[in-house]
Amino acid sequence: MKTAVCSALLVAASMIAGIDGAAAQAGAISDDVVKIGVLTDMSGQFSDESGEGSVTAVRMAIEDFGGKVLGKPIELVVADHQNKPDIASGIARKWYDVEHVDMIANLINSSIALSVTQMAKEKNRIAIVNGAGSSRLTNEACTPNSVHYSYDSYALARGTGSALAKAGQKSWFFLTADYAFGHALEADTSAVVKALGGEVVGSTRYPIETFDQSSFLLQAQASKAQVVALAGSGTVLVNAVKSAQDFGIRRGGQTLAGLLVWVTDVKSLGLETAQGLVLTDAFYWDRDDQTRAWSKRFYERMKKMPHMGDAGDYSSTMHYLKAIEAAGTDEAQAVMAKMRELPINDFFATNGRIREDGRMVHDMYVYEVKAPSESKGDWDFYKLREVIPGDQAFRPLRDSLCPLVKKG
C-alpha cells in the first residue's frame, strides 16, 4: 500500500514537472516572438555586397527553419544604415530597447559593426557580423554577445598575402580605403608579408567617397612594387581595378591584388579586366554540389549568384535559430553558449565552430580569376589555388588580445 502511494505521488510529481517544463518552454521566448534585424547598406557603395542580398539570405533561413522556433514566430525587420555610424547606432539602440530585436545581422562596414557589437554587449542582445571584416571584432574589441562569421581581415591577409609572398612577390604597395576595415586589412597583410621576408615600400590612403584614384595609382606605379594591393571593397575597389587596367599596372609587370573581392565585383568588372586577380574567399557558389544547390535557390530570387556575405548571413541565421531551439530560450547568453557548443555543418562550412573570442573558424580558399578563354559560362569566374584549413586561416588564440580568451 505504501509503495502504491509513493508510486502515485511520483507519477503526479512527474506530470506536474512536465506541465511546468512545457509552460517554461512556452514562456522562454521573450515577447512571444524572435525578432531578427538586418542592419545593412541598402543604397550606398556596399549595397551590392550586402543590401537586398543579405535580406534575402536571412529571409530564406527563416523560411527554411519553418518560420517559428519553440512554437513562436520569427519576425524580420530591415534598415539601411547608410554607412553612417551615428545612424546605425540610433537604429540599433531603438531595435534593442524599443522594438525588442533579439539579434542584429550582417552589419557591413567595420566602423558600424564595431559600434553595434559593443551595444549588443551593453544591452545583452546578440550581433552576428557577416558584412564587415575588421579582425578587431574578435581581437581587442571582442564581446561575449557577438559572432564574426564569414571572414575577417586576418584571414584575407593570411590567404592572399601569403600566397603571393610565397610565390616570390615580396615588395608591396598598399592603396588603402581610409576607414576601419581598410586600415585593418593593410595592417594584417603587411604583417604577413613582412613575416615571410617581404617589405612594404609604400602606401597611400583615400577617402571611401573617392571614385577617381588616378593620383593614388600613379604613386603605386612609380613605387615599382611587385604587388599593388587594394585594401578596400565595394565600388571603390571596382573603380580602382578599372583604373589600374587603364594605367597599365599589370602590363608594366606589377601584380594587382584585391584583398577583398566579392564575386559580384568580378561580375561588374568582367573577366577581361579582372582576369589574374588573386583573392581569398570563404565561399564560392560553384565549389561543390551543396553550394551549387543553395546558390541556385538564391539566384532564382536575386538573379545573381551569392557571395560569402550572403551565404554567411543564411548559415549564421540558421545556426542562431538552432541554438535557440537547443537552449530552450532566446536569452542571449544561453543562446551564445549553444552557438559556441554546436558544430556548423552545412553548405557554407564543414566542422565550423565558434571560439570564445566570437570567431567562427572554417576553411578559407585562395582563388585566381579566370581568363575569358577559361570560363565556361556566366558566373564561372574562379579557379582554386589553395585551401587554407580553418585553424591556420584565422588568428591563433595564443596571439589574441581578446579578454575573453583564457591563456596558460
Annotate each predicted stretch with a short phrase:
Residues V241-S316, E325-D330, S373, D380-K407:
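Extracellular/periplasmic periplasmic-binding protein-like sensory domains
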Residues V33, D48-S54, D64, K68-L137, ...:
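Beta-alpha junction/loop-to-helix N-cap segments that form part of ligand/metal-binding clefts
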Residues A28-R59, A79-D86, I108-N109, L175-H183, ...:
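Extracytoplasmic "Venus flytrap"
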Residues M1-V34, L404-G408:
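Short, low-complexity disordered leader/linker segments with a strong preference
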Residues A23-V38, G67-E75, A165-K170:
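Immediate post-signal peptide segment of exported/extracytoplasmic ligand-binding proteins
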Residues W95, E99-I108, I128-N130, S171-T176, ...:
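Periplasmic-binding protein-like
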Residues V34, P343, F347-G408:
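Solvent-exposed, acidic/polar segments of extracytosolic/periplasmic ligand-binding ectodomains
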Residues G90, S135-R136, T143-F247, F283-A293, ...:
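Extracellular/periplasmic Venus flytrap/periplasmic-binding protein
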